[in-house]
Structures are given as structure tokens and as C-alpha cells.
């Protein structure tokens, strides 16, 4: 005879008598099974039904029933109570606050830019130096910049090719040698609000802007450089009509335009250059470098849709230059709209930002200045103010150098 089948029949008969015809207790069920593990499995469904029917676990997860609850065993790459969270970097950046990579075991590995370290939660980034890049350390009352901060929890960057509705623009003529860019329709910045911004003085005072990338180097637009013209960099500048204690002046000892830049062929293609300073800057709350991510993340940050531009350029088309540092939030413009807005060639190393309705833009004198995207309280360089057709004109946009194309350089 088959003792297994006989035992199963005996248990089934006792179970029906003890727990189905009448309500039984756990102890009574235990007497039937004579095994705690089997009793537990039975009891989970007997008390409140099978919580795994239908299966609440998503993305191929396996369901384990429990009393008044259940547990999902998730497939690799998913997590959460119902395996609903993509544990890779594609969704909400893997919950990393700066950079995310997927390791060999398919687990998310968060990391931080230079000057930051991972917090104990292994997601956030904490400053590791007194004046880390991209952070505003001067205390201000709440500003537009702070309120507009982008957080990864609102962003699935796998869908980041979509951009926000058209907002404001930055411009400079591709034809005229004196059509440098300025901020039109912007706001007065607060002292120390854009501590990476520098002013370039040459044979014309305040002719361009730039961004601090470390104590010895500044990045600007290549078309701002003229052979034989001495350039002075002013960091910590705020009001150009006053000499302020926050200012630091350095001479440029070497200007390095990108090796593909050729002004005789096209003045604004590959419009990026590095400036080496004669003495290191002293970093403080008013003189702080901008963060630069790798190529992938610089492109991701740009596609978030909105960035900030700043400078001392003209405050209206063909008007006077600003004396107080100006800033403006500008939306990224999709490439098709950008190409339709002009007869001038827009190369793949450029992008458009600004407002279709006009009235706000960068303008003459802003060239070389930063286009930054603030992410989780840290600002990253995503563009360089390059050119445009006039300033703040309806249907025209500001054209910027796409920094992601030059990070490795």
C-alpha cells in the first residue's frame, strides 16, 4: 500500500472534520498536520483567504501569502512592496541624488561629483569640502532659483526628450561681430547667488562672461577671445560700478579655444574655450566653481527642460548694459522648433532656449556666460551663452553651446 496517500487521506479527512465543518483553532489544525510549517501554510489561507489571489506582484514577481498580508519576491531590477519600482537608473535616477550606475549584479550604485561624498543613505550627496561646486552658500530669502529646483523624484529621465513649454530666450546675431549676448527681461541677482559667474574685461570693459570650473580655470565662449587682447577675469563681481570686497581679479595667461573652433569658417560652431589664470582664485561663498557632470548626465540635465542664464549684458535690445548681475530662467526649445525659427544653420553642438513670445533673453555682453541646471540643490553647467538674432525678439531664441559635447575635452 502507499503510506503517503493513506496519510494524505487521513489528514484531509481530519481537516474537513476539524476545520471545515466547524471553525478550528491553530492548535487544532496543528494536531491534524502534526507539523508546524505545514500548519502555518494552511493557516495563512484559512484565516483570511489567499492574499496572493489574484497575484498583486508586478513585473514577474512571485507572491507569498501571509495573514492579512503578503510578500512579493521581486525579479532582479525591481523592488517595492509590489515590485512596482524599477531598481535600475532609468526611473527616478535610481533615487540617487546625483549620478547613478547599474552594477554587475543589477543593483543601483549612486555616486557624487567632485567635492561631494555619499551620505549614509547611499543616495544623497553631502559636501566634502568647504565650498563645493554648484552650491550657493550665501543665505538669501527664497528666490525663483530655489523654488525652481529640479528633483529626480519628479523625473523619469528615460522620457526626458520631451521639453517644457517654450519660455524665454538668449540671443546674438550670427552676422554681426558686435552682437554679443545679454540678459533682457531678467531679474537682479542677489550677491553670491551665482558664485561661479565671472566677468571678462579686455579692451572693452565687461565684454563677456564666463564660469569658474576650478581655482585656476574658467570656461567661456571661444568667440570672446581675440588674439593679442589681454583679458582680466573678475570673480565675485556683483555691481560693475562699485569695487566690492568680494571681487578677485586675475590675469589670463593662456586662452585655449576648442581645437575644432575656426572663426573664419563659423564664428559660433564649437564656441567654447578655457582660460588659465595667473594665480589661483580663493574659493569662498562668492567665488565657487560650477559643477560639470560627465557627458551622459550633462545631456540628461539639459533635457530636464529649464536652465538659468546670468550676466551683465544689455538689459534690452540695443540698450545699455546692466550694472547689477542679471539672471533669467529659460526653457529648452525642441530642435524642430529651433530650426524653423531661423535660416542660420543650427549645428548639433548647439541648442536653443528662450521664449517664443519674446521680451526675455540673453543679449550683448552675456556671451560666454553660463547656462546651468539646478538638480537637488546643486547646479551643473549645461550650456554656454553663444549667439542669437537680435535680443528678446518674438519667434527667435537664444543659441547656446552644448556642454555635453565637450566634457571629455
Swiss-Prot record:
Mg(2+) 3 binds at residues 37, 41. Ca(2+) 3 binds at residues 8, 18, 28, 31. GO terms for cellular component: extracellular space. Ca(2+) 8 binds at residues 237, 239, 242, 244, 247. Coiled coil: none annotated. Keywords: Blood coagulation, Calcium, Disulfide bond, EGF-like domain, Gamma-carboxyglutamic acid, Glycoprotein, Hemostasis, Hydrolase, Hydroxylation, Magnesium, Metal-binding, Phosphoprotein, Protease, Repeat, Secreted, Serine protease, Sulfation, Zymogen. Residues 48-84, 85-126 form the EGF-like domain. Ca(2+) 7 binds at residues 48-49, 51, 65-66. Mg(2+) 2 binds at residues 27, 31. It is found in: Secreted. Residues 183-409 form the Peptidase S1 domain. It comes from the Eukaryota. GO terms for molecular function: calcium ion binding; endopeptidase activity; serine-type endopeptidase activity. Ca(2+) 1 binds at residues 1, 7, 18, 22. Mg(2+) 1 binds at residues 16, 21. Ca(2+) 5 binds at residues 27, 31. Residues 1-47 form the Gla domain. Its main location: secreted. Residues 148-182 form a propeptide. The modification 4-carboxyglutamate is found at residues 7-8, 16, 18, 21-22, 27-28, 31, 34, 37, 41. Heterodimer of a light chain and a heavy chain; disulfide-linked. Interacts (inactive and activated) with F11 (activated) in calcium-dependent manner. Interacts with SERPINC1. Calcium binds to the gamma-carboxyglutamic acid (Gla) residues in the Gla domain. Calcium can also bind, with stronger affinity, to another site beyond the Gla domain. Under physiological ion concentrations, Ca(2+) is displaced by Mg(2+) from some of the gammaglutamate residues in the N-terminal Gla domain. This leads to a subtle conformation change that may affect the interaction with its binding protein. Belongs to the peptidase S1 family. This is Coagulation factor IX. The gene is F9.
